[in-house]
Amino acid sequence: MLSVFRIITLTLLASALAAPALAADSTRLLRFPDIHGEQVTFVYAGDIYTADTSGGVARRLTSHEGLELFPKFSPDGSQIAFSAEYNGTRQVYVMPSAGGKPTQLTWYNDVGVMPPRGGYDYRVLDWTPDGEHIMVRANRLPWGVRVGRYFLVPADGGSEAPMEIPEGGGGMFSPDGSKVVYTPIDREFRTWKRYRGGRAQDVWIYDLEQSTSQQLTDNPATDNQPVWVGEDIYFASDRDYTLNLYRYAEGEEPTAVTGHEEFDVLWPSAGPDAVVYE
């Protein structure tokens, strides 16, 4: 059974879609969570932390004055990949999930500071299921024609390589690594609410073996940040005017998993058998 976790301030909501609050309520703005087994990682005040899904004291892994974002557990949970501003530019790093010295993996100059609605360069999205590469979204074009593209970065170091998909926002590998679920349009950092225009996102699958794509959702609303858990795909959608988590199973219409009415589901991320979100 799928477990769904939500980080709201320092509150974790756990189990199969509903559970009691499990932590204190004094900390705010926990962001960009990821989950692996009984551990979650997240960003607070620009640093990376981990905590148990059952609650308790969070463990601080970084303390550099540079901003760290988008932590993602490796498939075996032993490492965390993330992006950070340590040397004047944003780059991708990896470190042990128990804490330790970060290792820099990318060396390509980033595009510099973008406007808030442009988000961040070098967004860490996922690992390949074999743990050998890290999937990132990065910009490589001038401002006037800037688009984000997916790249694979070797986890042990080496040159990054572009993926076949020409442009995209959030994305994640299928459990067997043969496909990617993604949105061709990136709009995660826009502040548009209940948008129904030409930049509304839909969820697609790209088959890496066949080099073909398939559209899964076709809705005037926003469908974004898709993740893959087992045979099912989960994504955030505001088709009911608040971003909630939806489940897509092959051959079925998407169904709502959460029913929030006041606050949106943001930045859902998945482990082998669970989804966590802001």
Model-derived segments and their meaning:
Residues 34, 72, 126, 172, ...:
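Conserved beta-strand position repeated across blades of beta-propeller domains
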Residues 37-38, 76-78, 130-132, 176-178, ...:
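Short coil/turn segments that connect the beta-strands within blades of beta-propeller domains
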Residues 7-18:
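Bacterial N-terminal signal peptides
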